[in-house]
Amino acid sequence: DANKINLDQFLLWYSQAGTPTLKISDSYNAATQEYQLNIEQHTPATPDMANKAAMLIPLELGLIATDGKELEFDLIEGEFVKPETNYVLLINQTQNIFKFKVNQQPTPSLLRNFSAPVIVDYPYTQTQLLNLAANDSNSFNRWEAIQTVYKQVIARLYASADEQAEYVPNELIAAISVTLRDENLDPSMRSLIATTPSFAELALQFKPVNVVKLSQAINYLRQRLSDALEDDFLALYQHHQTKHYDFNDAGKRALKNTAL
């Protein structure tokens, strides 16, 4: 094909069972301004096959600066395609290395637009997640980042003896506020980002689960966010009143209901 990619390996998606996991680590050399991603792929054994072959996995990527801006970079090692603005890394071995030329240490925005049905294992710090939640130009990753922070905060509240306001970082409140005010973001996506995970989803984190403690943790977080973001929610509720029940206004109604 035009990109000279051997797609035979891609057929493994149809013949090899199991969901691959990408274990990703990174490093940055400030002297050479080189950023490196080390990616290992592993597909767990299934009854019909113990050892799985390496898949061809497209991993869409962006790099985010500490101030939240999208970084420009050049890929200097590793296979890729670049259909539009984002690089799509081609992971085709058990271990792949990708090197980039970029002027500062970035936060990677990985698996943009859910470019492949895989599990990404990358050790994000909460600071990195909040940066992505507030600033990532990719709405899927923005949502994924803030959902992860919600789960971390609720886990801390669940484990604590008392509800602690400091367990809800101000940066989380700021990230949600930025999102709610972002008119470039679809209203339905803003509604999703401002919505905490469900009880059923959160309960999967704890075995066994203390139903009362988990309910208290969820309610505390929601109340804390409601109090801190009262002005934002009120402004959204007033702004997104809709008179017609058509498809184009569905996102606005969802955002209004979230604010309510």
Regions found by a protein language model. Name each.
Residues 7, 101-260:
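Long, ordered, helix-rich scaffold segments
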Residues 1-36, 155-177:
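Amphipathic alpha-helical substructures
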Residues 6-7, 19-110, 230:
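Beta-strand-rich binding/interaction modules
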Residues 18-21, 45-47, 139-141, 153-155:
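Flexible loop/turn segments at secondary-structure boundaries
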Residues 12-13, 23-27, 35, 48-52, ...:
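Generic detector of ordered, mature protein regions
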Residues 2-3, 11-13, 17, 48-53, ...:
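Generic structural signal for short, flexible, solvent-exposed coil/loop and linker residues
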